[in-house]
Amino acid sequence: MKIFLDTANIDEIRQGVEWGIVDGVTTNPTLISKEGADFEKRIKEICELVQGPVSAEVISLKWDEMVEEARKLASIDDFVVVKIPMTPDGIKAVKILSAEGIKTNVTLVFSANQALLAAKAGATYVSPFIGRIDDNGNDGLRLLEEIMQIYTNYGFETEVIAASVRHPMHVVEAAMIGVDIATIPFDVLKKMFLHPLTDVGIKRFLQDWEEYKKNKK
């Protein structure tokens, strides 16, 4: 499984890259606005740090405006993946952009039907929002299973990104069914390192080592 960071914060991205476990980054207008940074400069900076796919989202809602905006975003860096909303206009834009070789990530996906249409249009990635689905009383994991089965049945090359990840178990559940990518908030990524027995074990090793040194004197 590939791990993307869902953030526009440079310090978080730098830390993830230093850990050696981050394959890409996803951003959205909300994340960028929180940073108070220039949009294009921040996307370029992230691309230089990660050296992997970096999703940057269009603001337009009409297909022709999406295409124009997507071309500009794609020109920022070769690593840019253009996020397109799951709408009829969005799918039309994805079809055009895919034919031009521009990588796309269809976002705000909440059903297998939507994921099927995104793959048919040639999307590079599709992002089901599993956390929001769970929040709404439905089963985000079940949606991932449906999408993975459909893509396997027909040999679609579109990669699935588990998005709207709320906790480490979302990552485990996605990994167990073979989802290609999880895009993870930095706080959730940090939690993936943790287990109380690991802390207990480290403490015990250190205590034993100190005891050993005392006995050697």
UniProtKB/Swiss-Prot annotation:
It comes from Fervidobacterium nodosum (strain ATCC 35602 / DSM 5306 / Rt17-B1). Keywords: Cytoplasm, Pentose shunt, Schiff base, Transferase. One of its GO terms (molecular function) is aldehyde-lyase activity. The keyword Disulfide bond does not apply. Signal peptide: none annotated. InterPro entries: Aldolase_TIM, TAL/FSA, Transaldolase_3B, Transaldolase_3B/F6P_aldolase, Transaldolase_AS, TSA/FSA_arc/bac. Pathway: Carbohydrate degradation; pentose phosphate pathway; D-glyceraldehyde 3-phosphate and beta-D-fructose 6-phosphate from D-ribose 5-phosphate and D-xylulose 5-phosphate (non-oxidative stage): step 2/3. It is an enzyme of class 2 (transferase). GO terms for cellular component: cytoplasm. The active site is at residue 83. It is found in: Cytoplasm. PROSITE patterns: TRANSALDOLASE_1, TRANSALDOLASE_2. GO terms for biological process: carbohydrate metabolic process; pentose-phosphate shunt. It catalyses: D-sedoheptulose 7-phosphate + D-glyceraldehyde 3-phosphate = D-erythrose 4-phosphate + beta-D-fructose 6-phosphate. This is Probable transaldolase.
